[in-house]
Amino acid sequence: MKKIKILILGSSGSLGSQLVTDLKNNYQLIKISRKNFFFDENFDQLKKLIIKIKPSFIINCIAILGLKFCENNLKETLKFNYKLPKKVSDFSSKNNIKFIHFSSEAVFIGNKKGKIYREDDKGNPTTCYGISKFKADRYLIKKKNTLVVRLPLLYGPTNKNQIVSKLVSAVKNNKKIHVSTDVYSTPVYTPFVSSFIKNFVLVNSSFFFKKKIIHISTNNLISIYFFIKKIVKIIKKEIYLFPVKDSFFNKENENVIKPKYLGLKTKFVQCIDKTVINKKLISGLIK
């Protein structure tokens, strides 16, 4: 019996690599990333690949991240965060391919303390990153065979994850970490997201017709500072955390209104752990 083909875009990142781990035994995976595949301006090479392999699903984990980088590289940000999913969605809808695209809490304005955003809340991004993701969201919800999955802050078991990599670096190099006290999210464990895609989305076609946008979230709002403190407590290592206001990191982009009070709320896909951090979070990385 032939395995169903899935094309994973961005297979080397934190979420992409987790999906590869979870799906490789049950599906035939074709994995590409910006490191090993040339994405031309019109994505013609990608289109040729899709025609050749004929996947049943395409999962897009590619995203240009980082406030400073996105603000200074708008063309590249729009290319990968907006034009790429737009192109893939156009082609997928015409060829009966189901397309899963990951979006972000950054599509919201994030200026009201305590506010957690639902699927039906109106997007109003303030950064180039948020704008690029929001443009994609607005376009994709009109396309058939397409599902937008919005995610809050992700944390995971590998050093490809931004939070974990900072902690690993701090332990190994005996360095201090500056952490924002006034930025909030509803952090979700990366393997939970991957597991949900595997066990629910890929086996239930109604997601692509009845639900155009879903949030995966804990519904549990927490500051980044207290979240990282919870991780530090679990790993029982001496790490120097310095609480700072987020403006400490934003000195070069003072004119950019960065959202502080984000986080996603959903009645549909709620992580049951309520941000209870898995003790295997950084297994093998910090000893």
Can you annotate each of these PLM segments?
Residues 28-48:
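Adenosine-cofactor binding site in Rossmann-like domains, unifying the SAM/SAH pocket
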Residues 72-100:
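NAD(P)-cofactor binding segment of oxidoreductase domains
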Residues 79, 83-84, 107-149, 153-155:
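Catalytic helix-loop patch of NAD(P)-dependent Rossmann-fold dehydrogenases
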Residues 138-185, 190-199:
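NAD(P)-dependent short-chain dehydrogenase/reductase
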